[in-house]
Amino acid sequence: DGISKDLLDLMDEAETDTASHTGTSVYLAINYGGRLEITQAVNKLIAEGKTKITEDDISKNIYTYPECDLIIRPSGEQRLSNFLLWQAAYSEFWYSDVLWPDFKNEDLYQALREFEKRNRRFGG
């Protein structure tokens, strides 16, 4: 819902074209909601007959797996906005005042350089 057939076709084509790639993954969240993602994962597990649901069960049934290392938030906003709620648990965030349409390679490189300097503690 909310995405044109042409765009869906382009997204399917891009997914097919990159299916065999094994390097870095980039996820674009288009028409996405984190609460709905978690709800659908839990409902799927219930439909499969699960009576005790673990974190690992949910992780394996959400849209993206594995968890994200870095979440880049353009636009100057510093909030989750229902974005990757499950996957963001141990992610590092990088905020930019640059709007997404204006986001350039140099902005990405800056985010990656700063991420490289961080001491990730994964909740510890």
Positions of predicted regions on the chain:
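Flexible, compositionally biased loop and terminal segments
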Residues: D1-G124
